[in-house]
Design a protein with these regions (language model features):
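A glycine-rich, Thr/Ser-enriched phosphate-binding loop motif common to dinucleotide/cofactor-binding enzymes
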Residues: 26-41, 179
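Conserved acidic residues
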Residues: 14-16, 56-59
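Active-site/ligand-binding loops adjacent to catalytic centers
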Residues: 2-30, 77-80, 85-174
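Short, well-ordered alpha-helices that flank and scaffold nucleotide-derived cofactor binding pockets
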Residues: 44, 73, 77
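Active-site nucleophile and cofactor-binding loops and adjacent substrate-binding regions
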Residues: 35, 58-64, 87, 157-159, ...
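Phosphate/pyrophosphate-binding loops at sites that engage ATP/ADP/AMP, CoA/4′-phosphopantetheine
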Residues: 44-53
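N-terminal small/polar loop signature for handling phosphorylated ligands or for N-terminal nucleophile
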Residues: 4-5, 39, 43
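Short glycine/serine/threonine-rich phosphate/pyrophosphate-binding segments
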Residues: 61-72, 93-94
């Protein structure tokens, strides 16, 4: 927030650079394009291992949205692929301690962008909650908001306990320690 305030107050010598697909145009698109290397790599590896360059499903977590945008970038228009966006459900979507912005957010303005925002009845941005510091953003990028609005993506909320359980299972079964 402070960085964005400084940028707004000093436009002549301050440049807005963020690693998430949020904020005003053209930043969400720039970040998505830069992160698109993820979907390029997915296509390449699938072609090598499976003989086709598209998956059946893409499942990605959504907070600031950069990893999800990179994962789906080269597949967005391919209707064969089902896209699932997993939001940080925190203690539960109905508890008030959540970061499930797509499911609970209402149209508002955050960081120079009109999108879904977790906010009070009078439009004040509320503090989201998640065990994952990288997923507790009170807004959502325009790419993901649009995918949800068009029903191109299925949106689910994963609560903290489910996320921890999945992390342990991934480590135990695959030997991958999630970030």
């Amino acid at each position: 927030n402070e960085a964005i305030r400084d940028w707004c107050c000093h436009p002549a010598d301050t440049f807005y650079i963020i690693g998430s697909t949020v904020g005003p145009h053209p930043y969400p698109d720039m970040v998505a394009r830069l992160q698109s290397i993820i979907s390029e790599e997915i296509k390449k590896q699938l072609l090598e291992k499976e003989g086709r360059d598209y998956p059946d499903y893409l499942i990605a977590c959504v907070g600031g949205g950069s990893n999800a945008a990179g994962t789906i970038y080269h597949f967005i228009d391919d209707e064969r692929i089902k896209i699932v966006l997993a939001e940080a459900g925190g203690k539960g979507v109905d508890t008030g301690l959540t970061a499930a912005t797509i499911q609970l957010g209402k149209t508002g303005i955050i960081h120079g962008s009109r999108t879904y925002v977790i906010q009070s009845e009078d439009g004040q941005i509320e503090e989201p909650y998640s065990i994952s510091a990288g997923l507790d953003y009170p807004g959502i990028g325009p790419i993901h908001a649009n995918l949800a609005a068009q029903r191109r993506a299925t949106v689910i909320a994963i609560n903290d306990d489910e996320a921890i359980e999945a992390a342990y299972e991934l480590t135990r079964i695959e030997g991958i320690i999630p970030a």
